[in-house]
Regions:
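N-terminal cap/lid segment of alpha/beta-hydrolase-fold proteins
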Residues: 3-30
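Catalytic active-site module of serine/aspartate enzymes centered on a nucleophile-bearing elbow/loop
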Residues: 261-304
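Flexible "cap/lid" loop of the alpha/beta hydrolase fold
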Residues: 137, 141, 149-183
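Conserved HGGG/HGGXW glycine-rich cap/lid loop of the alpha/beta-hydrolase fold
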Residues: 28-89
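Conserved loop-alpha-helix segment in the C-terminal half of the alpha/beta-hydrolase fold
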Residues: 228-270
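Alpha/beta-hydrolase
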Residues: 177-178, 183-236
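Active-site loop/oxyanion-hole signature of alpha/beta-hydrolase fold enzymes
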Residues: 80-131, 143, 150
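Glycine-rich His-Gly loop
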Residues: 49-53, 130, 243
């Protein structure tokens, strides 16, 4: 069920987003969601956005609105941002639990028509940035061959700045940090976000007054890697967005090269928050990929 929120509700988002609530985990917890509709009518399919962190709310991805010509659906993961924050624990804040939340989110959005149907099937694109990409990938692959119902498959998946192996990522981070003499501030300015002053959307996501997060950082994903089985199970177009100076290096993304239908785009001169550093180039790469998938699908339908 998708429950609308009034503008005066404390969980409401900035203007331009229609806020709503998504009950998960049997209705015991509520996730905040935000729905953007373009000013002019569009036949483009919606993009469902999974933010990263773990635990950085959706605010830093709101600039997607200005770069894409389509509906966009955001949500804050449990324990983060405007969503409910149950008591911290391994069961509440785990990849498996969050993957199931995402599955329920997608199912609710389809049921309520926020995700439309085309030719009788739910029609949307799925996008994950950083940790959000891990959740998106797991949601689509973990149910392969399982008796548990998974989400309806999207038309495409975008993995933006997402490692295929967190252990390899941690090795890369240690090496990059060593080159900088262990200077965390220089690492941040070189490999996290190279734009100064910091983009307002990123400042907002980390602001002291923000509802915040109960996630415990990278520790919850330290052992995660995409398995050969899950890589082989994913049979849909995938856009891999990388950045020249990102701490999520190409080496830490090598596993994604084994996906059957993948397109790699490396954005020059930017780091982990490439959307905020070079929004036009980022948006053009993403929108071009999404349009390509929709055009190919339309051609396939018209030829049958």
């Amino acid at each position: 069920m998708v429950i609308p929120l009034s503008e005066g509700d404390g969980t409401a988002a900035p203007s331009g987003l229609r806020s709503f609530v998504l009950p998960v985990r049997g209705g015991d917890c509520r996730l905040w969601g935000g729905h953007h509709l373009p000013a002019s009518a569009s036949e483009a399919l919606p993009l469902l956005v999974c933010h990263g962190g773990p635990g950085v709310p959706s605010d830093y991805l709101f600039p997607l609105i200005g770069q894409l010509r389509r509906p966009i659906i955001f949500f804050d993961q449990l324990g983060c941002g405007r969503s409910d924050r149950p008591s911290p624990g391994e069961q509440e804040y785990s990849i498996a639990a969050s993957v199931q939340d995402l599955v329920e989110v997608i199912q609710s959005l389809v049921l309520e028509g926020v995700i439309p149907r085309r030719d009788g099937l739910p029609a949307y694109h799925l996008y994950g940035q950083s940790f959000g990409g891990i959740l998106a990938f797991e949601a689509l692959s973990v149910h392969h061959g399982s008796s548990r119902p998974g989400p309806p498959p999207p038309r495409s998946l975008t993995l933006s700045n997402v490692p295929s192996s967190v252990p390899v990522l941690l090795e890369e981070v240690a090496a990059l940090l060593a080159v900088l003499g262990g200077d965390g501030a220089r690492f941040d300015a070189t490999h996290v976000c190279r734009t100064l002053p910091r983009p307002p959307a990123l400042v907002a996501a980390y602001a002291p007054g923000h509802p915040g997060s109960d996630w415990r950082g990278v520790d919850v994903i330290a052992d995660w890697s995409a398995t050969e089985r899950s890589l082989g199970a994913l049979a849909l177009p995938v856009l891999l967005l990388a950045a020249e100076h990102d701490f999520v290096t190409l080496r830490s993304m090598e596993g994604w090269q084994r996906l059957a239908q993948q397109r790699l785009v490396v954005l020059p001169g930017v780091a982990h928050h490439a959307l905020l550093e070079t929004p036009e180039a980022y948006g053009a790469s993403l929108e071009s990929f999404l349009q390509d998938q929709e055009e190919e699908a339309n051609c396939a339908v018209s030829s049958t």
